[in-house]
Every structure is written in structure tokens, then in C-alpha cells.
């Protein structure tokens, strides 16, 4: 692992002199000394903490800007089972999550997918490495400060089992609680709640109903509505299609594609058909390491990659391959994401006959 370096192009001009000094310190620090800094003095609160340790106030992260439209970078992230650095779960991964895109973390069970998204959302703290988004930097083992809290408030996390994040006894309270805590609405604001319930297809649900009495699909949509009500800039969903029928998956896909216009979205999923229809980019994990990062279309149309990872192609990709093997020439195969897209490209062929 290399010691982290501050990305020069992301530093405002007035801070570049400070950044240069910090980079020199990081270059001179061995890995052993780097961890010693983290564990003994906990001085890596942000890139410039070296220079402000006595004041305990950040010079750079006082007010976060451009989170929604900035790429989220992660560098050399590692996660160990315990403080003795035994049992490495995530192994020095580096990558990025682009704004206005849906990025999927993909890989076999036990590869570290859920662990990775928890680090990126700061639900859990990485053992080493750092995150950067806009003018926000977060180093492993640092103390949480105002900037960290602001970044965390910009993130919405929807668990695989939605009921595990329910806190209230009614649908109305469940949607409003997080937004009230952030000062976005008042208690009992029915119109505010209805806006997000309608967005998630729950306009017909009684507001006084207990969330635990909803169906599995409705619970997932309610959990999403409560997160969206907090007006997050980064949405993380763990296995969003588990327990959903085809109609529910189609609704979820359409909603996420609409939401990506105003936020970045990261999902963990094994559902190749949903991924192919919905996501833009893919990060492939194997045994805690990133082995590929590319567009979803390129990944699922690369038969060598799919064979290497023993992945069954999405149904629509299999259908396209069968048609092409029969000599059917499609206008733009990579643009076909759903059966409806395929039918639209096949219609002119039948009309020509």
C-alpha cells in the first residue's frame, strides 16, 4: 500500500501551499509511521490537520461544497476484522463513483460488497485509506467533525431488510422523522410526506398504518421514501430487488433512473437483469479486491469476462446473442436494456418484410 496523496487539482488555489507541505510529510512517512500517526495521535482529521492540530479546527473542510456534482474517489481503502489487522475483508481498493450515475457493486457472496458500501457511506470506518468528494477528505481512523457529519447527512442508506431501519409506529412518522431532524419539515407535515410517498408509489397507503404491517415490497419503498425525504445527495441501496416481483422491479428501476438526475446512486445487487436495465457503471469485487471497473454494457457483453467470473448473462443479452446467431442484424445492440427495447428494434425488421 502507498501512503495517500492529496489530489492537487481538487485543492483550491489558496490552500495549495498547505497541501504541498502535507504531501511532503505523507511522502516521507513510511506505512509503519502512517499507521502510527493514525493510531497514536489521530491527527489525520483532514489533509491539513498537521498544520492545525493545536487549534483542532479544519482549514479546508469548514463548509462542504459541490458534493452532488463531484466524483467520489476512494483510495487504498482496507478493512480488517479487528484492530490487530487480522482478517482483511477489503484489500487496498481504489476507484470512483460518478455523479448522476447508478453504480453497482457486483461480485459473489462474501466478496465484501456490503462492507465496501458501508465504508463509502461512512456507516462504518475503514481501517486505512481515505475518501475524497469535492473539498471533503476523510482519512481512516480520524475523529468525526462537523464536515464529516455534513457529509454523512448527505448520504441515504437503504438496508436489504427495510424493516430493520424503521423507527416509528406510523407511515407518516417514518417518512418525516429524518427530515424533521434535519430541519427540512415540521412534525405532522402531511403534504411533505405525501410528496415522497407518491414518488415511491405508496400514495394509496394509509398514513396511520404501522410500517411493519406492509408487504415486503412496500416496506422497501417506504424505507426509500423516508431516505429521499431527507433530500440526500448520495443514495446507497443494499439488494434493492430482493423480495420484489417483476412489476416492483420495473417500478424501482424507473424511479432510480429518474433519481440519478439529481443524485449519485450506488447499489449492491446479484440481479443481473435489474443491473443491466438500471445501472450505468459496475465495480466487480473478488475476495475483497476490485478486479474490474467499467460500464455495465461493456461488462455484460464481454463473454470472456462473464465466463471467467462464471456469470450468467442477463436474459436480454442472451436473447440478442441467439438472434445474432440466426443472422438477425440489430441496429444498436448495446442500447437494448429491456425486452421492450428489443421489440422496438425488431419492429422495423418485420415491417420490411
Swiss-Prot record:
It comes from the Bacteria. The keyword Zinc does not apply. Residues 72-312 form the ABC transporter domain. One of its GO terms (cellular component) is ATP-binding cassette (ABC) transporter complex. ATP binds at residues 107-114. InterPro entries: AAA+_ATPase, ABC_transporter-like_ATP-bd, ABC_transporter-like_CS, ABC_transpr_CbiO/EcfA_su, ECF_ABC_transporter_ATP-bd, P-loop_NTPase. Keywords: ATP-binding, Nucleotide-binding, Transport. One of its GO terms (molecular function) is ATP binding. Belongs to the ABC transporter superfamily. This is Putative ABC transporter ATP-binding protein MG303 homolog. It comes from Mycoplasma pneumoniae (strain ATCC 29342 / M129 / Subtype 1) (Mycoplasmoides pneumoniae).
Amino acid at each position: 500500500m502507498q501512503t495517500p496523496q492529496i489530489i492537487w487539482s481538487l485543492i483550491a488555489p489558496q490552500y495549495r501551499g498547505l497541501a504541498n507541505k502535507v504531501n511532503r510529510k505523507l511522502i516521507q512517512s513510511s506505512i509503519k509511521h502512517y499507521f502510527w500517526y493514525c493510531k497514536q495521535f489521530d491527527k489525520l482529521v483532514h489533509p491539513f490537520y498537521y498544520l492545525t492540530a493545536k487549534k483542532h479546527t479544519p482549514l479546508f473542510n469548514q463548509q462542504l461544497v459541490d458534493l452532488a456534482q463531484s466524483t467520489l474517489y476512494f483510495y487504498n481503502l482496507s478493512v480488517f476484522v479487528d484492530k490487530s489487522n487480522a482478517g482483511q475483508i477489503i484489500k487496498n481498493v481504489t476507484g470512483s463513483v460518478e455523479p448522476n450515475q447508478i453504480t453497482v457493486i457486483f461480485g459473489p457472496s462474501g466478496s465484501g460488497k456490503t462492507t465496501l458500501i458501508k465504508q463509502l457511506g461512512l456507516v462504518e470506518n475503514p481501517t486505512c485509506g481515505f475518501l475524497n468528494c469535492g473539498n471533503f477528505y476523510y482519512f481512516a481512523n480520524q475523529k468525526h467533525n462537523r464536515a464529516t457529519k455534513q457529509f454523512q447527512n448527505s448520504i441515504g442508506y437503504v438496508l436489504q431488510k427495510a424493516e430493520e431501519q424503521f423507527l416509528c409506529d406510523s407511515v407518516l412518522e417514518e417518512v418525516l422523522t429524518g427530515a424533521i431532524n434535519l430541519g427540512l419539515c415540521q412534525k405532522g407535515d402531511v403534504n411533505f410526506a405525501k410528496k415522497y410517498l407518491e414518488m415511491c408509489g405508496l400514495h394509496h397507503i394509509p398514513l396511520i398504518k404501522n410500517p411493519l404491517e406492509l408487504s415486503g415490497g412496500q416496506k422497501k419503498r417506504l424505507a426509500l421514501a423516508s431516505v429521499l425525504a431527507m433530500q440526500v445527495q448520495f443514495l446507497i441501496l443494499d439488494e434493492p430487488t430482493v423480495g420484489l416481483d417483476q412489476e416492483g422491479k420495473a417500478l424501482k428501476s424507473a424511479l432510480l433512473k429518474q433519481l440519478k438526475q439529481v443524485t449519485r446512486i450506488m447499489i449492491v445487487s446479484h440481479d443481473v437483469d435489474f443491473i443491466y436495465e438500471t445501472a450505468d457503471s459496475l465495480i466487480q469485487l473478488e475476495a475483497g479486491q476490485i478486479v474490474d471497473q467499467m460500464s455495465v454494457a461493456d461488462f455484460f457483453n464481454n463473454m470472456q469476462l462473464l465466463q471467467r467470473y462464471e456469470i450468467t448473462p442477463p436474459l436480454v443479452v442472451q436473447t440478442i446473442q441467439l438472434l445474432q446467431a440466426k443472422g438477425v442484424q440489430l441496429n444498436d445492440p448495446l442500447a437494448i436494456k429491456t425486452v421492450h427495447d428489443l421489440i422496438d428494434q425488431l419492429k422495423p425488421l418485420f415491417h420490411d418484410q
